[in-house]
């Protein structure tokens, strides 16, 4: 009986853990969305384009399975909590 109860507890914990999904902000539209299975990190990528001096940096937000490789001229931040990739002063459009 104890073994059966222990087995049920373990199965319950595993099932609850597998069902969890991360939520991250996405760029278009700027709102939190549930990430696809296996993508448990949020990222914020920013860089300058031709309009950087007038509009500021281009910002891309989303979910990822692993943090993208940093490329020259791009800033990348990854985090592992829900909605951790926010951008200050952005409003939903």
Swiss-Prot record:
The keyword Secreted applies. It comes from the Eukaryota. Its main location: secreted. Residues 1-21 form the signal peptide. Pfam families: Toxin_cobra-type (PF21947). Keywords: Acetylcholine receptor inhibiting toxin, Disulfide bond, Ion channel impairing toxin, Neurotoxin, Postsynaptic neurotoxin, Secreted, Signal, Toxin. Expressed by the venom gland. It is found in: Secreted. One of its GO terms (cellular component) is extracellular region. Disulfide bonds join 24-42, 35-63, 48-52, 67-78, 79-84. GO terms for molecular function: acetylcholine receptor inhibitor activity; ion channel regulator activity; toxin activity. Belongs to the three-finger toxin family. Long-chain subfamily. Type II alpha-neurotoxin sub-subfamily. Binds with high affinity to muscular (alpha-1/CHRNA1) and neuronal (alpha-7/CHRNA7) nicotinic acetylcholine receptor (nAChR) and inhibits acetylcholine from binding to the receptor, thereby impairing neuromuscular and neuronal transmission. This is Long neurotoxin 2.
């Amino acid at each position: 009986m104890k073994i059966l109860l222990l087995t049920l507890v373990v199965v319950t914990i595993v099932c609850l853990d597998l069902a969890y999904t991360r939520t991250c902000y996405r760029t278009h539209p700027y709102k939190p969305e549930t990430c696809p299975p296996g993508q448990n990190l949020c990222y914020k990528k920013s860089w300058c384009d031709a309009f950087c001096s007038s509009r500021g940096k281009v910002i891309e937000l989303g979910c990822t399975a692993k943090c993208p490789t940093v490329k020259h001229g791009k800033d990348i931040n990854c985090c592992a909590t829900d909605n951790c990739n926010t951008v200050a002063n952005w409003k939903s459009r």
